[in-house]
Amino acid sequence: LQCYSCINQVDCTSVINCTXNQDACLY
């Protein structure tokens, strides 16, 4: 699993608890 900032949601397969600048994208 790798975490990316909310700004990079495009590269995420699924988004979980994406708030502010916290890393939330997991795949």
Swiss-Prot record:
The keyword Lipoprotein applies. Its main location: membrane. It is a lipid-anchor; GPI-anchor. Glycans are attached at residue 17. InterPro entries: Snake_toxin-like_sf. Disulfide bonds join 3-25, 6-12. It is found in: Cell membrane; Secreted. Transmembrane segments: none annotated. Expressed in erythrocytes and lymphocytes. Not detected in platelets. N- and O-glycosylated. Keywords: Cell membrane, Disulfide bond, Glycoprotein, GPI-anchor, Lipoprotein, Membrane, Secreted. One of its GO terms (cellular component) is side of membrane. The keyword Membrane applies. It comes from the Eukaryota. Interacts with T-cell surface antigen CD2. Potent inhibitor of the complement membrane attack complex (MAC) action, which protects self-cells from damage during complement activation. Acts by binding to the beta-haipins of C8 (C8A and C8B) components of the assembling MAC, forming an intermolecular beta-sheet that prevents incorporation of the multiple copies of C9 required for complete formation of the osmolytic pore. This is CD59 glycoprotein. It comes from Ovis aries. The lineage of its organism: Eukaryota, Metazoa, Chordata, Craniata, Vertebrata.
